[in-house]
Regions:
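Catalytic-site microenvironment of enzymes
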Residues: 1-25, 37-51, 60-61, 68-377
């Protein structure tokens, strides 16, 4: 898979591959030889259904999602590879079925990793087929024959909620990863005299100081002089055994009138799954920022971006505003405004861990209130 984008007007082997997959998925009924308007519309529909950025352009993320979507359970044997892990809708279906029967695969993410292999082994042992951790014909047949044995809500959601509640309301000793976009030579979006790399790093530093004062162990995915790629950020975050991961970005658009703040959590319409903790935290962040600032509420959205999907802890991405909008850029360029954003996020983090009966009205809780309640130092 290459990193080059394929879009309207292109042709060639990659375009043919895209058309073939879209046909198999039922999103195209014709077989165009070039990337025309019908292909672009089909790509947009696919991106929408998969929680990807909807632009009709097939970049590396969309091409990877198309490749994963073409696999159905039974098309191939599934097993743990020592190099590149197997990914696909067939893996997600396997994980979902095992989870429904009470076997812990972790998050249903469509990636065949260690936890999925262990769950397959446990399932194989329970049904009396060869225990090798590989999902071949015999294991698939056993899966198809068995019905659900767990009820009362999706088990993965129940596990995530239970683990979250078990951590208690105090922020002390929790581990939070802060992920400022860009860094090093990558300065990100630049408009109206404001630079993405500087804005997000400044917000992260302000948030880091507040969290450290609350007893939180804080990890940053980058400093000022480096710019890790997405895979490196995911690997780093997973090694910290974090309770929560927060990624900071700004946005841009061709129409300078686009403005406002938005948050994103992991959720897949195609697989009917989402991170319940991620969704709640994204909602809390959105509400706190909008209650304390005049940024437009661009709402909370489920996405399947790898940073949200492949991180072990609940992960939320915050797009702090549009630098291509003069008003948003002016706001984000002010230190006092960035300070309010940092305050909003730390309060949202605390509200995430408070029981509903102890929670406060959006926009009213202050750090001093946490001290008085005995849940900060």
């Amino acid at each position: 898979m290459n990193d080059l984008s394929t879009s309207k007007g292109n042709s060639g082997d990659v375009t043919i591959q895209i058309v073939n997959i879209l046909n198999r998925l039922g999103l195209l009924v014709t077989q165009p030889t070039a990337f025309d308007g019908t292909v672009e519309n089909a790509v947009r529909a696919f991106q929408q259904s998969r929680g990807l950025t909807v632009n009709g352009v097939v970049n590396s993320a969309t091409l990877q999602a198309l490749e994963e979507a073409r696999w159905k359970l039974g098309d191939r044997s599934l097993y743990l590879q020592s190099s590149q892990l197997m990914r696909g809708d067939d893996v997600a279906t396997l994980q979902a079925r095992l989870t429904d029967m009470g076997f812990n695969c972790g998050r249903v993410d469509g990636v065949f990793g260690d936890r999925t292999e262990n769950a397959v082994r446990e399932f194989q042992q329970s049904v009396g087929v060869k225990v090798d951790g590989k999902c071949g014909p015999a294991t698939i047949t056993a899966l198809i024959r068995l019905t659900r044995t767990v009820s009362g809500g999706a088990p993965s959601i129940l596990r995530e909620s239970a683990m979250h509640k078990s951590r208690g309301p105090a922020l002390a000793n929790k581990v939070i990863v802060l992920d400022p976009n860009c860094g090093g030579g990558d300065r990100g979006i630049f408009a109206h005299g404001v630079e993405e790399s500087e804005v997000v790093y400044d917000v992260v530093q302000r948030l880091e100081g507040r969290l450290l004062a609350l007893g939180v162990s804080v990890f940053l995915t980058r400093g000022t002089n480096n710019s890790p790629n997405e895979s490196e950020r995911i690997i780093f975050s997973n090694k910290t055994n974090a309770d929560l991961i927060v990624s900071f970005h700004v946005d841009q658009y061709i129409n300078e009138k686009a403005h406002g703040v938005a948050t994103y959590f992991y959720g897949s319409q195609a697989h009917g799954i989402h991170s319940v903790v991620g969704e709640r935290f994204a909602s809390l962040v959105q509400r706190e920022i909008c209650a304390r600032t005049d940024l437009l509420n661009c709402r909370t959205h489920a996405k399947t971006w790898d940073l949200l999907r492949l991180t072990k802890a609940p992960t939320v991405r915050i797009d702090l505003g549009y630098l291509t909008n003069e008003g948003d850029a002016q706001r984000l360029g002010r230190a006092d405004f960035r300070d309010v954003i940092a305050e909003s996020i730390v309060i949202a983090i605390q509200r995430l861990y408070l029981a509903s009966e102890d929670d406060a009205k959006t926009g009213t809780l202050r750090i001093d209130d946490l001290r008085k309640a005995g849940i900060r130092r």
